[in-house]
């Protein structure tokens, strides 16, 4: 009996101990709220350096975070709280900006309104909405530090609100991203709208994601999580976030 206990004790000593400083794996919380006002949260450990709002695209599969979960979990590991507003219950079925604002406001309250910069990233329709959202976030007392617009879509002014960019804070940094196998029409439209509103050109950068090897830089490449997506999409967002901390 004593010999068995001693053997167990020695085995326990030989096993690697868990590091007390190791952060827990990112955990999705929610959805909180109802209908188009619903949202999901992820919390950085031990405390956030930034809050990132992730605006999704126009598709049934985008109404929950699973298309972007790898990118979101990467952001959490980098020290960001993340908010994923649902903003609609069917594609183009709700006033996207209104429900985004409601979801973001209640999410920030749930997070305790951390006194850190807020960055918005959006994909496809959400890429355009991300810039428009930054222009109306003053309504919930938020001054966004930066926006990354990934493969933004064009505006259908018959169905969607036309946002006046004159309220977009001139301190906000904008990064508009296009792909070499995707239409740049949405980014060009955003640039024209920004110029008309006299937004400072020096606060706007553009980047092109390039096809490389088996990586095809088309509209759906933002849903990938391989090495090229990480290098050409994840890393630029990481740098943008770091620049406003």
Identify what each model region corresponds to.
Residues 109, 115-169:
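Primarily recognizes the serine-hydrolase "nucleophile elbow" in alpha/beta-hydrolase
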Residues 145-213:
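The feature captures the conserved acid-bearing segment of alpha/beta-hydrolase catalytic domains
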Residues 201-245:
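C-terminal catalytic histidine-bearing segment of alpha/beta-hydrolase fold enzymes
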Residues 5-14:
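Bacterial N-terminal signal peptides
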